[in-house]
């Protein structure tokens, strides 16, 4: 391919993102310096500063910025998207709280770990009731394990952490009617016995210790295979959070009223209304003070809304990252494992590495997202402290290195059309799936495709267009053959263990990458050594280096969650170690915004 010096221009929301595409001294990406349009992320607060007394009968209105409808799955056992989590949050409450190290502490239930006996004991606190007035009991603690472990379960949470419970696999295979490793101690307490104790069990996560209960009595007569679409999940969920769902407008809004049985005291609001809001309308909506709280404001428009009067900004670095993934195999639903295909189009790691080196994520984060995102160097997010490898270089733009990797691997332009053929001299066309939504999606996809073109790769949008979010994940999860690689994101939760995302038996391992080394390193994360912080840091460092080299997934950016909150709101605290449901103490102090 003839060398050219090209400049790609991507214009988004009034910003021009200028990126060196290839050639000469422009072959390496440059760090973008901060300017007045870039967020100073150290200025964000975690809690509202309004200390006035809340008025009676107040209504809190929340706008959730999204260009796709929420699915409306109001059950922790079945939901698998952050949008449903958001629309469930005022009514939903976890069993446990979280400390500053993201580890589980007592909450609505008490938890006790016995490493020697390999048991976890969970005890409901007295006075915790479901929103229909019934006590949350031991049956409700056990029930989600019975649902998830059943062979007819339709969700995605039956994985290696569930199989670690003694007797779970026999129950799943139909050899037993109960899980032998789970016993009811009394009406309020269960004890779970595990094959091995793992560090992930200490995290506020779902690594064998579920952080939620299910109201067993509301599912009487409903087959497990039908639960995900049943009324207790879709229409009238029974919960024990501060509010209860009172009205659902499918895909658009949810209304909440106080849960009169809430164990944490009487909520301060008479109603919460949560609505979806298109990205294109978000800034205008905030200017008109339509909502009290805005979830998911577009970072690409940060300069347009960051200084609007009547709001203060709460924010912190998210436990999430965006990434580019490669389809490298299939999910075997019969065996419950990922099957790697060494002959798949994207199987050559040099091709994957070249794709990573061709793009400038530093510039994207600074220019496109106004500093509310940063270049990601690892699949472990910085919030995990010593387990995060800050010294890992990751992938910074180096166009010449990308070209050399492709040349050395045998991807060469043999017909002079500007695009490289595969190693066998056949046409190489890479189908790239990209989620629709937001003001930046189309332009970012176009930038990526242009950047890859400059190193000689013919990348096209799978289906020929951006894909609606729900359809996108359906295609990716079901290994649609029209997709070779895709752009997506993960909200990691509070557990750094990677078995649930990249393990051999993880359905969420959408790349389907499997290797003996990857499996070995991931298993070490749940070993006895990993209980020691120093040893755990070494284990995680080794896996991060391996994942970076294999490049089955390319982390692109980390982000900051920034939430504008009306000055009339009091008691709203987004700290991860807050000891109550985030809406339990929220009130408003005036009639008008």
Named regions from a protein language model:
Residues 83, 109-157, 285, 344-346:
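Aromatic- and charge-enriched surface segment that lines or borders ligand/interaction sites
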Residues 206-264, 271:
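Gly/Pro-rich hinge or "lid" segments in bacterial periplasmic/extracellular proteins
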Residues 343-450, 592:
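Append "and occasionally in soluble cytosolic enzymes with long acidic Gly/Pro-rich linkers
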Residues 565-593:
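Long beta-strand-rich cores associated with HINT superfamily self-processing modules
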